[in-house]
Amino acid sequence: MPYRLEKDFQDLIASNNNIQKDICSVLEMDYKDFKLLREDTYINGIIADFTLFERNKVRAIIECKGGAIGVSEYVRGIGQIFQYEYFFENHLSLKNYEFCQNFNSVLVFPESVLKNNDFNVGLFKYPKSKKILEINSHNLAVRHINDNELEKLRETKHRDFKVISPCTRNELVFYKK
């Protein structure tokens, strides 16, 4: 399984311009206005995997998860992006960052998280500012799991269905176990 470790997945995002461009596209921002800062420290010693700047203001704080996680680590990631939203709402920054009004807290992970687990990502509470991104580790396509997809997943509460991560963007496929 590629990108099992969070550090390897972070390295991929930090080094791949196409992934960075796709993230900018999901966030509806121009790549030329983009700057990515890795392992940025916020209050209480919280270290964000990435801070994404647009015109020198914080546009997003990104939490990465490696491919070898289970439900507990996924929920921990949700907690982290809730905290990032709190930083935005209260203008909390050790470095006196300004925040964009269209700020997003981002949770990003490889497709293996959905393929290899039985939990339903539609049955969690997420912050209002959230963007959930899945990166296909084979073709490096970035997919935004939007509110419509989360709603479809919420409707399949029973365990007879599982999400299969797509090989292309903007597809959500279910299969019966």
What are the residue ranges of the model-derived segments?
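Charged, terminal alpha-helix-loop-beta segments
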Residues: M1-K177
